[in-house]
Regions:
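Helix-loop-helix
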Residues: 79-81, 85-88, 178-192, 262, ...
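An intracellular "coupling" helix at the cytosolic face of ABC transporter transmembrane type-1 domains
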Residues: 34, 39-42, 132-133, 149-158, ...
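ABC-type nucleotide-binding domain
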Residues: 349, 356-602
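Membrane-integrated ABC transporters
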Residues: 1-58, 74-86, 104-108, 112, ...
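Transmembrane helix-loop-helix hairpins at lipid-water interfaces of multipass membrane proteins
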Residues: 45-100, 107, 180-185, 283, ...
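Hydrophobic alpha-helical transmembrane segments of ABC transporter permease domains
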Residues: 46, 58-62, 88, 100, ...
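Transmembrane helices of ABC transporter permease
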Residues: 43-54, 93, 163-214, 286-298, ...
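Juxtamembrane loop-to-helix connectors within ABC transporter transmembrane domains
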Residues: 29, 37, 104, 108-112, ...
């Protein structure tokens, strides 16, 4: 029974957007990733490549100097002068190689940091421009994973992975050329095991790739739950669901652990394969090389050089397992990053969109329909008009379509049918910036950012002066409680304003909206979470706030909309009634029933 309950907990969430992305490795994607290096192709990048070339050249020269020149010429001829010269040259080359490696690491780290900064900035900027539907389909945790974890996993790829791959490929090419130059038959003999290793490693490739994709998926799920648990800790504790929450965390943490374990297990199979092949190659070198020496086909110096080069040959191949691991992790992360970057806003701005510096605020809905998905229709042919400067109240049960109308006015979504106009202009013809900059929205659960109260109010208009901020706060009655704080307007508040009461947070949001000086104000259940005393203050402030502005009020407390110019009653996305407060009461319909029910329970 306990197991089945835990299994049910583990199935609590499912994020369809975080499924494993199954795409074969392709160079087009790799080139797209490397395109972020282009801004540095004339500075850090060529310097890094230069150090790679110098380091590789030094490594390739030293075995020849030791084997062919030191052993076969200096020592065999007992030429001490030549030996000293060669020792000095080899020592100098080692110093040069050290300097090249230091500079390579330094410049590649700089390049990697630049690329990661640019990529994260690009992704965050792109996500900021995506439509609300994108965020409806994804958890905050899964988005955070891609912006932070997935991009971080690319850091090692750029700082060492790509350059190591280039270095190893150059080294392998150089070693193979030199080996064939020294002795083609010995080279062929020691490489007989390569096809076997290539066949086995190719079969492992897809499995290793998929395992790292699974790791990314499980990390996303784990981070999503952590983010949700922290945000909802009060609800968890209020309902004493700590044990259930910990059980779920144990499940996703176990899944994450198992995915890492499986990925490292499969990846660990590669290095022993290389070492086994290296051992076979070394055995062939000793046996066949000794035969060639005894036949005087090659010298001892060439044999020693071969031994050096054989180590240099298998060393990068062995490292290729680690580099390939970095590459696979990078590709898995880049697929997820590019999936976000390829997302297009559902709400698109026309190239010739009109940028109106000032709108009057007249709003009209003409047979407007909207669906959040194919199964759920939120609005059914809704029509109404709001003259500029007037107040419209929307009333109805939860799910009746009130918030949907507010979202459509702000163009967070596009209507699936009908036309919405602002000042007689179809809303799609207006630029998003000019439209949204002249609309202020105050929500029931207002968001307070980490920072000072001054900064939170300034969010409505960042270029406003401190005096203007204080005037806005005074107008909505927020100045009274702000001035009573130890630091006043410079008081630091935590994320979501947890140190403030619901009423205080709402007053700050009103001040923020007033400071923005919008033509249209949308109040979405804005007075639902405040006490009666605070509501009286806000009702006074609203008269100042709404004066000369178009207002759309989504009402929970029907007492707050008595003075609205017009009230529309919605039910399951349909407009059922329309009129003033007194008219609708006299009609004795849905609105009258809602008022009666609220007063009888209040």
């Amino acid at each position: 029974m306990k197991q089945s309950k835990k299994q049910g907990i583990l199935e609590r969430f499912y994020y369809s957007s975080d499924e494993i992305i199954e795409k074969p490795f392709n160079w087009a994607q790799m080139w797209r990733l490397l395109s972020y290096v282009k801004p540095y192709r004339k500075t850090i990048l060529p310097l890094s490549f230069l150090t790679v070339l110098i380091g590789t050249a030094v490594k390739l020269v030293i075995p020849i100097l030791i084997g062919v020149y030191v052993l076969d010429q200096a020592i065999t001829a007992r030429n001490s002068e030549l030996l000293i010269q060669l020792i000095l040259i080899i020592s100098g080359l080692y110093i040069l190689n050290y300097a090249a490696n230091v500079l390579r690491i330094r410049w590649m780290n700089q390049l990697g940091q630049h690329v990661i900064y640019d990529l994260r900035q690009h992704l965050f900027t792109h996500v900021q421009r995506l439509s609300h539907r994108f965020f409806d389909q994804r958890s905050a945790g899964s988005i955070l994973v891609r912006i932070m974890n997935d991009i971080n996993s690319l850091q090692e790829l750029f700082t060492s992975g790509v350059i190591n791959l280039l270095t190893d490929l150059l080294l392998l090419a150089g070693v193979i050329i030199i080996l064939f130059t020294l002795s083609p038959e010995l080279t062929i003999a020691i490489m007989v095991t390569l096809p076997i290793m290539f066949f086995i490693s190719t079969s492992l490739r897809k499995k290793i790739r998929r395992s790292w994709q699974t790791v990314r998926l499980k990390q996303s799920k784990l981070n999503s739950h952590l983010n949700e648990s922290i945000q909802g800790i009060r609800v968890t504790q209020a309902f004493t669901q700590e044990e259930e929450n910990m059980a779920y965390f144990d499940g996703v943490n176990q899944e994450n652990y198992q995915s890492w374990r499986e990925a490292t297990r499969k990846n660990a199979m590669f290095r022993p394969l290389v070492e086994m092949t290296n051992a076979i190659g070394t055995a062939v070198l000793i046996w066949y090389g000794a035969t060639l020496i005894m036949n005087e086909t090659i010298t001892i110096g060439v044999f020693v050089s071969f031994a050096f080069y054989l180590g240099m040959f298998w060393e990068p191949i062995s490292r290729l397992g680690q580099v390939y691991n970095q590459l696979l992790m990078g590709m898995a992360s880049s697929e997820r990053i590019f999936e976000f970057l390829d997302e297009q806003p559902n709400v698109k701005e026309k190239p010739d969109a009109i940028h109106k510096k000032k709108i009057n605020g007249e709003i009209s809905f003409e047979e407007v329909e909207f669906s959040y998905d194919e199964k759920r229709k939120a609005l059914h042919a809704v029509s109404f008009s709001i003259p500029a400067g007037s107040t419209l109240a929307l009333v109805g049960h939860t799910g009746s379509g009130k918030t949907t109308i507010a979202n459509l006015i702000s163009r967070f979504y596009d209507a699936t049918g009908g036309t919405i106009k602002i000042d007689g202009v179809p809303i799609q013809n207006l630029s998003l910036a000019s439209l949204r900059s002249q609309i202020s929205i105050v929500l029931q659960d207002t968001f307070i950012f980490s920072g000072s109260i001054m900064e939170n109010i300034l969010f409505g208009r960042p270029d406003a002066s401190e005096e203007e901020v204080m005037k806005a706060a005074q107008a909505v009655g927020a100045d009274e409680f702000i001035s009573g704080l130890a630091e006043g307007y410079q008081t630091e508040v935590e994320e979501r304003g947890s140190v403030l009461s619901a009423g205080q947070r709402q007053l700050i949001s009103f001040a923020r909206a007033l400071l923005a000086d919008p033509a249209i104000i949308i109040l979405d259940e804005a007075t639902a979470s405040i006490d009666t005393e605070t509501e009286v203050k806000i009702q006074r402030a609203l008269k100042t706030l709404l004066k000369g502005r178009t207002a759309v009020m989504i009402a929970h407390r029907l007492s707050t909309i008595r003075d609205a110019d017009r009230i529309i009653v919605l039910d399951h996305g349909k407009k059922m009634e329309e009129g003033k407060h007194e008219q609708l009461l006299a009609k004795g319909g849905i609105y009258a029933g809602l008022v009666k029910a609220q007063y009888s329970t209040g």
